[in-house]
Amino acid sequence: MIIKHFFGTVLVLLASTTIFSLDLKLIIFQQRQVNQESLKLLNKLQTLSIQQCLPHRKNFLLPQKSLSPQQYQKGHTLAILHEMLQQIFSLFRANISLDGWEENHTEKFLIQLHQQLEYLEALMGLEAEKLSGTLGSDNLRLQVKMYFRRIHDYLENQDYSTCAWAIVQVEISRCLFFVFSLTEKLSKQGRPLNDMKQELTTEFRSPR
């Protein structure tokens, strides 16, 4: 009876892990596709050659190293991605009617960002079923917020000029490439299904 119950538990665990793995891959694939579309739409928003605005360029100190996913759990990476996309969405939504921007392109860009946020929230929901919590994610989110605070301050100091926005759009493109990189690494995080099978088999064979 105990052995039967154990194998029943193993089958349930493997089935749920398989479903989770498939859902995760599907959502990450969708998020990756949407991110690529967002980059294309962002390029269409540029109304001024960046060469004209080089004197206004600024290093906003994108915290790529401190936000590297290798040192964090999957839940932390999801928190970073979610905060970055949320901040980008808020930045452009507040300036949707900016002179020189085609409103149609801006709206499409916001729709794509919103889709990414929905996919990430779905991922976070799946991950919540696997993890008890994501301690330390508040500090990571704070780093992202401080980075975007520097962008907001720059725009304000430059009176939201066309050149300032051109510089910021290039910076947001960097952000989206970073998001793309994080998404790629996210798909490689976590234990493979074969590792789970091996662990369960070892557990069954180990003497009590």
Curated annotation (Swiss-Prot):
Question: Tissue specificity, please?
Answer: Endometrium-specific.
The UniProt record lists the keyword Secreted: yes
Q: Indicate which residues are glycosylated according to the record.
A: N95, N104
Induction is noted as:
By estrogens.
Subcellular localization(s) per the UniProt record:
Secreted
InterPro entries (UniProt xref): 4_helix_cytokine-like_core, Interferon_alpha/beta/delta
Q: Which UniProt keywords apply?
A: Antiviral defense, Cytokine, Disulfide bond, Glycoprotein, Secreted, Signal
User: Some GO term, biological process aspect, for this entry: which one?
Assistant: type I interferon-mediated signaling pathway
Pfam family for this entry, one: Interferon
State a single Gene Ontology molecular function: type I interferon receptor binding
Q: Which region is the signal sequence?
A: 1-21
Query: Which parts form a coiled-coil structure per UniProt?
Result: none
Question: Which PANTHER family does the UniProt record give?
Answer: INTERFERON EPSILON (PTHR11691:SF8), TYPE I INTERFERON (PTHR11691)
Tell me, in a sentence or two, what this protein's role is.
Type I interferon required for maintaining basal levels of IFN-regulated genes, including 2'-5'-oligoadenylate synthetase, IRF7 and ISG15, in the female reproductive tract. Directly mediates protection against viral and bacterial genital infections.
Question: Per the similarity annotation, which family is this?
Answer: Belongs to the alpha/beta interferon family.
User: What name appears for this protein in its UniProt entry?
Assistant: Interferon epsilon
Biological source species: Homo sapiens
Name of the gene this protein is made from: IFNE
